[in-house]
Amino acid sequence: MGQQEAQQVNAQLPMVQDAQIQNYVNALGNRIAHLTSRADLNWQYQVVNSDVVNAFALPGGFIYVNRGVLERASNMSELAGVLGHETEHVVRRHSVKQLEQAQGANVGVGILCALTGVCQSGVAQAAINIGGTAVFAKFSRTDEIQADEGGFNNVMRAGISPRGMYTFFQKLLAEEQSSGGGGSAAAWFSDHPGTQDRIADIQRMLNQVPASQLNSLQVNDAGWATMKARLARLGPAPRAPAQ
């Protein structure tokens, strides 16, 4: 499960057209995923050309992260926190549960506008208008807590600091509050419920790790600055339509 849905998504979503950016994110994701219990999957991490701050996972190891996440992330560990979280949704089969609930709906149409704000066809917009996206766009609060806990452990196992997960979520929360709920991070809070409580849970997990161990974990890597420089040289991403 997941291959057919990924093909639908790839046919609809505009991807970032820079091989080095795509390769960097895919390598970082695989660094994390290959140390989980589902190292057997053919994990694929792709960057969607959307300024909306969001990411999503399909069964089988297909992870999509929006360009907006890369632009907001200040270091590799912040991006790794998002990838570790989405990876855990696959490990725990949360995405399988969503697809089973969908009962054969068109996934490529179903998640396109809700998660990226980018519609490549009138059909996709029509699906949004009739509410066809809800089953794909949201995991339960319990699913999100499990993905946070597993994602925290996933990045640590890969030798990456889990502080990035905490600082990235804090950054998005501050942006959301300052914008009055209408910023480009709004999709994250819509699709990832209970963020404030989850930030507190991540802080609790951080407090349980010795400071010396946290300080020994990686925050950046050799490719981060190059990836960000290439990202800055891209043309503007398609903007989400005004709500």
Language-model-detected regions and their locations in the chain:
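A Zn2+-metalloprotease active-site environment signal
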Residues: 1-243
